[in-house]
Amino acid sequence: MKGKKWTALALTLPLAASLSTGVDAETVHKGKAPTADKNGVFYEVYVNSFYDANKDGHGDLKGLTQKLDYLNDGNSHTKNDLQVNGIWMMPVNPSPSYHKYDVTDYYNIDPQYGNLQDFRKLMKEADKRDVKVIMDLVVNHTSSEHPWFQAALKDKNSKYRDYYIWADKNTDLNEKGSWGQQVWHKAPNGEYFYGTFWEGMPDLNYDNPEVRKEMINVGKFWLKQGVDGFRLDAALHIFKGQTPEGAKKNILWWNEFRDAMKKENPNVYLTGEVWDQPEVVAPYYQSLDSLFNFDLAGKIVSSVKAGNDQGIATAAAATDELFKSYNPNKIDGIFLTNHDQNRVMSELSGDVNKAKSAASILLTLPGNPYIYYGEEIGMTGEKPDELIREPFRWYEGNGIGQTSWETPVYNKGGNGVSVEAQTKQKDSLLNHYREMIRVRQQHEELVKGTLQSISVDSKEVVAYSRTYKGKSISVYHNISNQPVKVSVAAKGNLIFASEKGAKKVKNQLVIPANRTVLIK
C-alpha cells in the first residue's frame, strides 16, 4: 500500500450514544510504513451537503465515496479532479442537530449518513487514491441528549455525574464566557451545569481521569476504523484556555491524548482549532502537529478585498517563526474561511478574479492549505450558519446526487456556480483551483519551503520567496484590478503565470490585474 496523501475528515464527533466503549472494530489499515511527510492540500467537507447516494435529500458517506474521484481520482496525469491530498470531514456521529457537533454516540455513524461499514469503505477507497482522511473530533462537550448526561441528571450517584461540571453554592451563575456568552445553564432537574457554547452542549469534566480515558478510547476506536487523524474541535476550551492555568492544563491534556494516539498509530495527524491570536495558539504546537491560522486567514481575505497588501507575507513569516519556537516540525493550518465564517466569495462581493487571487495566495504559502467545500466553485453564503453550509452545487439545475436537505438562499444554481458549468469553462474558478493545486504539488519549494517577504514598490503586490534545499521560487500576486509593473531581480525565468499577459524583461515584471506569477 502506498503512503497516503493527507485527507482531513472533519468528523466533529458528537459524544458517544452508548455508555460503553466496548465496540468491536475491524482494523482497516494494517502494517502501514511510518512516514514523516504530513504535507498536503485538504478539502473540508460537510457530508450532509455534498452528495446524496440514497435519494433522501441528505448527503451521506456512500455519496462522498462515490465522489472521491472529484477530489482525487488517484491518477496524477488527469486534469478533471482537484487532486487534493486529504479530506477533513465534518461531524458524522449520531446527533440531534443538523450540524452534528453535539454527539450522542462517539462510537457510531449517524444513520442519516450511513453506518460503520460505509465508513470503512470510504477509508479503503481513499487509501486507493493515496488520500488521507481526518475526522473532526468533538471532545470538549457532548449533546445534552447523550446517555451520559441523561444518566447524570437522573442519578447523582451515577458515575456519569462526574463526567460533567456542576455548580455549587459558591458558583457565580452569572459568569460569562470569552465572547460574553452565558456559560451556566439550568438543567431540567433544577441544577446548573457548565456549557461553553450553549445549553444543548454540556462541557465534559477533564479533571476526571475517567473522562480522559473515555475520550482516548474514542480516538483509538476511530484509528482502528481507518481514520488517519483528527481535527480537534474547540481545543482551546477543554479547560478555560484564556487563563494561564487553563491553557497549561489544556496542553497537558493534549499531550496525553497525542501520546496515546501515536502509540496506536505513530503517523497519526493531529490538527487543532484554537481560535485566537497567534500568541495564544503557539503553545499548543507543543502537543499538536498543526493548528489553524485564523490571523493569517483574515489578512489574506482583507488584503484581497481591499486590493492592497496588508502584510500577508510579514504575518506568515512572523507566525512561522513563533510557531517553530514551540515545534520545529509544525505544519501551519492555512485557509481562507471555514464552516463557522461567511464564505470567502461573499466577503469578496462575488468577484471571481479576487477569488482566484485569494486561492493563489493560499496555495503558495507554507503549511497545509484547507479548502472549504464549494469555495472552489465560488459558492456564497453569510451567517446564520445554515446558510454557509448550503447544498454543494453539482449541476446548474437538479441532477443525480444533488442534496436538498435545506432550500438554498444563496446557491440556487443557474448562475454558473456549479461543477457542471465550471468544468466546461476553461478560465473558471474551479479550473483555477485545479491548476494551482497542481502547481503547488509540482514544486517542493511551495510545499515545504521557508518563506521570506520580498519588498516591492507597490502595495497592490503581495511578494515572497519560497526556498527549499537551496532552491527558491519568487511569488508575486497582483491583487488589484489594474496591471502593475514592479522591479525584480534580473536573474530568474518566469515559470508560471495564472493567466496570459505577464511579462518579464530583465528586472521589470508586468503582472496583469488579479494574476499570480512565479519566477525561478
Swiss-Prot record:
**Which reactions does this protein catalyse?**
Endohydrolysis of (1->4)-alpha-D-glucosidic linkages in polysaccharides containing three or more (1->4)-alpha-linked D-glucose units
How does this polypeptide assemble, per the annotation? Monomer.
Record protein name field: Alpha-amylase
* Family matches, as InterPro entries: DUF3459 (IPR022567), Glyco_hydro_13_cat_dom (IPR006047), Glycoside_hydrolase_SF (IPR017853), O16G_dom_2 (IPR045857)
Q: Which residues form the signal peptide?
A: 1-27
Keyword list, A-Z? Calcium, Carbohydrate metabolism, Glycosidase, Hydrolase, Metal-binding, Signal
Q: What organism is this sequence from?
A: Priestia megaterium
Q: PANTHER family from the xrefs?
A: ALPHA-AMYLASE FAMILY MEMBER, NEUTRAL AND BASIC AMINO ACID TRANSPORT PROTEIN RBAT
Q: Where is this site: Transition state stabilizer?
A: 340
Q: Name one GO biological process term.
A: oligosaccharide catabolic process
CDD domains given in the database record:
AmyAc_bac2_AmyA
Kindly give the Pfam families that the UniProt entry links to this protein. Alpha-amylase, DUF3459
Q: Which residues bind Ca(2+)?
A: 140, 203, 237
